[in-house]
Amino acid sequence: MGDSDLTAIRRKALRRGRISEYVAAVFLMLKGYRILALRHRTRLGEIDIIARKGDLAVFVEVKARHGEAAAVDAVSVAAQKRIRAASDLWLARQADQARLSQRYDIVAIMPGRLPRHFLDAF
């Protein structure tokens, strides 16, 4: 496989990831969440979606897979640590940080199915 083939595969994966994040964001909005950030980057890592519902800040990892179990399993312990570290940086910048609760969710995006929202996944 040549470099251009790998680049095309990578571009396709990035595009699929972005589309999945937008689908997950719309899904969360329909469930009453307010989307604060998509693909929030910090020096410690990236958070796919930061959402809020009342005094609850939700940090969401989005995974596009063929099944729910594969999506949940795709969020490694290392990724969980990076997301938690990045969320700590985000929380530190919030004026109402003291009253915010936090939760870490996963949204699984699967072909031909509605998204599946795993609350408090890690």
UniProtKB/Swiss-Prot annotation:
Gene Ontology terms for molecular function: nucleic acid binding
InterPro entries: Restrct_endonuc-II-like, tRNA_endonuc-like_dom_sf, UPF0102_YraN-like
Source species, domain of life: Bacteria
One Pfam family named in its UniProt record: UPF0102
Family: Belongs to the UPF0102 family.
Name of this protein: UPF0102 protein RL0336
Origin species: Rhizobium johnstonii (strain DSM 114642 / LMG 32736 / 3841) (Rhizobium leguminosarum bv. viciae)
